[in-house]
């Protein structure tokens, strides 16, 4: 009998400690799982499409096999795309060391002989397409919000009511239309040149803000300027029958912007051209509120990186590294995911790579002893970094030459791609503490930073300077103490002994010294891979920055094995057809976003009005986040609830489920249920989840094997470390949602996000849509092209990319008929080649390979530096921007460098004033809550959008709480016991799995389950909440499904045999009649009882700087329930 890899792994996981098993049986394991490969030939009766997966957000390539079944095309199989840099090709000759994709120029007929690796999630994408709970027609609420009652409406009614307003007939509620908020349209209909008016109005607002920030101007002068503004524009608008309040949110606060800002577009999972498309739409509406779910994704990691590097996504090159420190980065989950990270495991198993896996949970493989688990206490990652940095400083394990270069030109002249600010001097006392000493401060007539190089000089006047300096300098303000940026870091590291740092983080002292020695041997070809486990804490940005100081010290940046950002991509938005997200004639917009990201409180009129009245401007009503690179779920909902900084009238939410995916996101139900705070809520989705249950309108969307998220996308850092990489996603099958019309150019339109936004834009007459709405650029300069449907937009994108790739020499000048014929016979999108006839042959070449990719071996110069352009000039050990930024509640300045700070609230609960709040362990001491719950990701499931993965659910039908054996023994807990986890916000019951794969004092509950709404509703019984208001809303949930049968379930169209194959373990009521199958709503999520910030009205806990959701710090105690549950250890797969 040949043991399959899947069967073997299932058996392997049954062993309590996989690492112990592997240690003794590695040779046997190697023989058992060594696969046999045969050439895979194309199906003679089917189609093959190379596209991109969206089982998670890693963006691997896929090969989709489509065949005829019962007269209908169906997806039969999904495997890996061998051309894609993540999947890596497989052949009989490459059964190990599978590190490379197929060469990009491999003819498609040859490429079809090979396959690429792919994880289980990618293979089970079939069940996302064929999901009985999918919505296929537009729906309208037919009862109170949250009742679960919806009725089908026509596409035309949907568009008309969203634009002009509608009525919930069953309750009598009036729903506003977007037309009421479309300031550009209101001005245009009145006969104004809308953008001329808005542009002049914004200039006037800017002038008001200049007066506000001028210390010589009084409160009276400021109010006079505002009154003059109101008088001017009331008169101008009145000439054509308009009032100022028809255009502005609040004429007394003109800095808040136009009424268009009262529309929020919030997306959950985003992909390249879906993102560009609806960002373009939001800007065409004139709103600043295009928001993303990043606070629930990796925003702490992003914000931390942005501070020190100027770019948000930076990781170590896993292909060229000799050593990796994976800190808070989960094996098999983080980019490049289970598929791409197979390369890390394989390199480690082959002895080419050493990995230290610093995480509260184990990696579940030792790779022949080369992946070493370093258990750590949640939230103490900066303490670990400080211990390691201290040893590196003590032993001189750093690149002093690299660190000494004071400016970028000098560093590049010496062969480095950039410099650090290690030598820049920081003022260390007085009101300007934390700011850089500038040339003008000491009479040098320059605003450049000052360094010490035998004397005090500006950094641009010398090549090298002292990296360790602590002394005094005479300034215009008197004698001041100054320190170099690296001196400050060194002193922070030496503020505690290695033993004291280890006492905080729980890491063995000997391990710190061991890692330091391994760094010495591997530098500079080593680096850190950091992610959610370190970043998604209140102190997350400081954690990330402290860890990245390891990389800066050894000078590994922008080189093989070291830190790199994302690969570049083609000019896919503006090579020939200008489809970029801005500068297409959109309305002028201004004002702070509702979540206040990238905007300082000190730049608001609210702040300056208070200050000029002589009031303390602090606290602000909610925090502002000037240094975060992206947006926040929690602060969006808090802003809506508190109407701060202004009320919101309409929310369009796409591909999202914040109620379940955010920590304590159940609080958001209060906002979603309240029609006075949120008058219009539109959901664009494939099914009705826990958030969309409260929507007024449901727009059916397509998924990624259809037109959903089609287009081109970059890959996350390091993008396999190549110079250019992008996937091209095109449909494998045509959409199963309703055909809603034909565009004027004869192309079919299917119900989806794409066509909904286009049709709304056409009805509102938004700029950038319709006849001649897309301008030609480059070779097409002066020409205009139509935008009436999704196919036109996407074909312009593919044409742009293909022609740029041709210009770069990646797509050949002459494309063979064989390549074009393959695409025209296999790809549904080929039927729209008429849109880009001149570029079609080159588009076909890229489509045939699922994207454009370069090769790793061509991506570095002879010295090992990346051929990519460096993303920045300088990286930072100290940030003046952060040191000058203030906590919006206390008004205190943030600390401007890497530092260990305990996880804490945003503001102190008492009278103390500082830039961070009360430590959480003071509020929730270990004596009351001895455990911390963490929610690691699962290699099988993706947060809370994986319930349709039928095959995966058979492997892992529910999740569990993993508890360390020593903790379990003290509590008398065994695997299979149902335990009660009690947190400050509530309690949940979950089955226990006793394993040594989690650090003592920590409980791990893999996320991805615990659902209660997905078109059908199954009232949750596994948790109880302490918040009476939220608990009452949960108790009001309906139980069951009340959707019309013709509104859902595209599976009914399939051949009976195909249905039985797809759903082998389910009653036909599940796939024919929307019956509730128990596996769909099994398991738990710890998010419902996660921590809140008691200093901010009990909203979900966030990071201080980036507003990231805090997932990995849930204080808890454990109680036995006396109940047991049948529990199969082979199903412990996380």
UniProtKB/Swiss-Prot annotation:
CDD domains: MopB_CT_Tetrathionate_Arsenate-R, MopB_Tetrathionate-Ra. Changing residue 15 to Q: Strong decrease in TtrD binding. Its EC number is 1.8.-.-. The keyword tRNA-binding does not apply. One of its GO terms (cellular component) is plasma membrane. It is an enzyme of class 1 (oxidoreductase). It is found in: Cell membrane. Coiled coil: none annotated. Belongs to the prokaryotic molybdopterin-containing oxidoreductase family. This is Tetrathionate reductase subunit A. The gene is ttrA.
């Amino acid at each position: 009998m040949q043991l399959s890899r899947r069967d073997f792994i299932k058996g392997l996981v049954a062993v309590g400690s996989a690492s112990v098993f592997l240690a003794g049986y590695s040779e046997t394991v190697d023989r058992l799982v060594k696969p046999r490969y045969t050439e895979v030939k194309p199906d003679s009766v089917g189609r093959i499409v190379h596209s991109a997966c969206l089982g998670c957000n890693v963006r691997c390539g896929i090969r989709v096999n489509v065949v005829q079944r019962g007269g209908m095309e169906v997806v039969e199989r999904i495997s890996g795309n061998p051309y894609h840099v993540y999947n890596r090709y497989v052949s009989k000759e490459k059964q190990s060391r599978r590190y490379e994709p197929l060469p990009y120029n491999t003819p498609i007929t040859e490429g079809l002989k090979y396959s690429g690796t792919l994880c289980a999630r990618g293979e089970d994408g079939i069940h996302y397409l064929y999901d009985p709970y999918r919505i296929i027609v537009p729906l309208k609420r037919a009862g109170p919000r949250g009742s679960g009652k919806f009725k089908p409406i026509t596409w035309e009614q949907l568009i008309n009511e969203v634009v002009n307003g509608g009525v919930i007939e069953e309750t009598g509620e009036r729903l506003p239309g977007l037309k009421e908020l479309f300031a550009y349209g209101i001005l245009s209909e009145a006969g104004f040149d809308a953008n001329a008016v808005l542009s002049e109005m914004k200039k006037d607002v800017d002038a008001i803000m200049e007066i506000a920030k001028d210390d010589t101007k009084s409160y009276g002068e400021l109010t006079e300027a505002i009154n003059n503004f109101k008088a001017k524009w009331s008169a101008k608008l009145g000439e054509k029958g308009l009032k100022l309040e028809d255009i502005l949110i609040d004429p007394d606060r003109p800095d808040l912007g136009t009424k268009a800002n009262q529309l929020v577009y919030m997306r959950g999972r985003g992909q390249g051209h879906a993102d560009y498309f609806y960002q373009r739409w939001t800007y065409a509406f004139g709103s600043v509120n295009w928001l993303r779910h990043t606070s629930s994704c990796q925003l702490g990691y992003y914000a931390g990186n942005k501070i020190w590097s100027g770019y948000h996504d930076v990781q170590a090159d896993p292909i060229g590294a000799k050593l990796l420190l994976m800190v808070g980065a989960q094996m098999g989950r983080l980019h490049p995911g289970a598929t791409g990270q197979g390369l890390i495991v394989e390199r480690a198993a082959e002895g080419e790579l050493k990995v230290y896996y610093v995480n509260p949970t184990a990696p579940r493989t030792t790779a022949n002893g080369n992946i070493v688990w370093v258990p750590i206490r949640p939230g103490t990652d900066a303490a670990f970094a400080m211990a390691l940095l201290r040893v590196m400083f003590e032993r001189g394990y750093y690149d002093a030459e690299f660190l000494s270069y004071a400016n970028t030109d000098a560093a590049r002249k010496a062969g480095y791609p950039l410099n650090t600010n290690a030598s820049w001097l920081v003022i260390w006392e007085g009101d300007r503490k934390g700011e850089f000493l500038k040339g003008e401060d000491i009479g040098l007539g320059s605003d450049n930073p000052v360094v010490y190089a035998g004397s005090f000089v500006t950094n641009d006047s010398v090549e090298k300077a002292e990296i360790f300096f602590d002394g005094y300098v005479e300034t215009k303000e008197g004698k001041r103490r100054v320190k170099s940026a690296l001196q400050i870091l060194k002193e922070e590291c030496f503020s505690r002994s290695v033993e004291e740092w280890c006492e905080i983080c729980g890491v063995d002292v000997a391990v710190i010294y061991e890692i330091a020695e391994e760094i010495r041997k591997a530098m500079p070809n080593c680096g850190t891979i950091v992610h959610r486990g370190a970043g998604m804490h209140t102190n997350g940005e400081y954690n990330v920055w402290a860890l990245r100081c390891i990389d800066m010290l050894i000078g590994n940046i922008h080189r093989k094995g070291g830190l790199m950002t994302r690969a570049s991509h083609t000019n896919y938005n503006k090579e020939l057809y200008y489809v970029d997200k801005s500068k297409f004639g959109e309305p002028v917009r201004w004002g702070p976003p509702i979540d206040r990201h990238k905007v300082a409180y000190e730049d608001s009129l609210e702040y300056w009005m208070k200050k000029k009245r002589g009031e303390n401007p602090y606290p602000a009503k909610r925090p502002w986040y000037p240094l975060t690179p992206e947006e926040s779920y929690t602060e969006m909902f808090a802003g809506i609830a508190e109407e701060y900084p202004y009320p919101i009238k309409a929310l369009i939410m796409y591909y999202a489920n914040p109620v379940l995916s955010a920590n304590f996101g159940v609080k958001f139900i209060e906002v979603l249920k309240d029609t006075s705070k949120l008058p219009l809520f539109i959901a664009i989705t494939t099914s009705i989840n826990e958030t969309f249950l409260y929507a007024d309108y449901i727009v059916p969307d397509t998924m990624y094997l259809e037109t959903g998220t089609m287009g081109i996308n970059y890959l996350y850092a390091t993008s396999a470390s190549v110079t250019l990489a992008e996937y091209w996603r095109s449909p494998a099958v045509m959409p199963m949602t309703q055909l809603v019309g034909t565009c004027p150019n004869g192309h079919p339109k299917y119900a989806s996000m794409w066509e909904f936004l286009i049709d709304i834009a056409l009805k509102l007459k938004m700029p950038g849509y319709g006849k001649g709405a897309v301008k030609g650029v480059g070779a097409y300069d002066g020409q205009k092209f139509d935008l009436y449907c999704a196919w036109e937009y996407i074909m312009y994108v593919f044409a742009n990319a293909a022609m740029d790739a041709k210009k770069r020499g990646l797509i050949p000048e002459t494309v063979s008929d064989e390549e074009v014929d393959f695409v025209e016979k296999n790809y549904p999108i080929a039927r729209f080649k008429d849109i880009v006839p001149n570029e079609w042959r080159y588009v076909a070449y890229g489509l045939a390979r699922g994207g454009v990719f370069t090769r790793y071996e061509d991506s570095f110069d002879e010295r090992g530096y990346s051929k990519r352009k460096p993303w920045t000039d300088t990286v930072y050990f100290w940030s003046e921007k952060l040191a000058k930024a203030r906590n919006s509640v206390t008004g205190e300045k943030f600390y401007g460098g890497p530092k260990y700070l305990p996880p804490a609230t945003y503001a102190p609960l008492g009278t103390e004033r500082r830039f961070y709040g009360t430590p959480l362990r003071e509020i929730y001491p270990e004596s009351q809550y001895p455990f911390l719950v963490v929610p690691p990701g699962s290699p099988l499931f993706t947060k809370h959008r994986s319930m349709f993965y039928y095959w995966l659910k058979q492997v892992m039908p529910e999740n569990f709480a993993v508890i360390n054996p020593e903790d379990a023994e003290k509590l008398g807990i065994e695997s299979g016991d149902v335990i009660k986890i009690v947190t400050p916000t509530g309690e949940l019951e979950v089955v226990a799995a006793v394993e040594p794969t989690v650090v003592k004092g920590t409980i791990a509950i893999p996320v991805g389950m615990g659902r209660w709404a997905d078109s059908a509703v199954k009232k949750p019984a596994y948790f109880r909440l302490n918040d009476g208001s939220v608990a009452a809303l949960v108790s009001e949930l309906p139980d069951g499904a009340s959707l019309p049968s013709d509104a859902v379930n595209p599976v009914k169209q399939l051949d009976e045999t195909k249905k039985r194959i797809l759903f082998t373990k389910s009653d036909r009521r599940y796939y024919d009649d929307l019956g509730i199958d128990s596996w769909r709503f099994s398991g738990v999520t710890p998010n419902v009882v996660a921590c809140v910030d008691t200093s901010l009205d009990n909203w979900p806990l966030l990071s201080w700087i980036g507003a990231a959701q805090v997932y990995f710090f849930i204080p808890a105690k454990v109680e036995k329930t006396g109940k047991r549950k049948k529990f199969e250890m082979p199903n412990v797969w996380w």
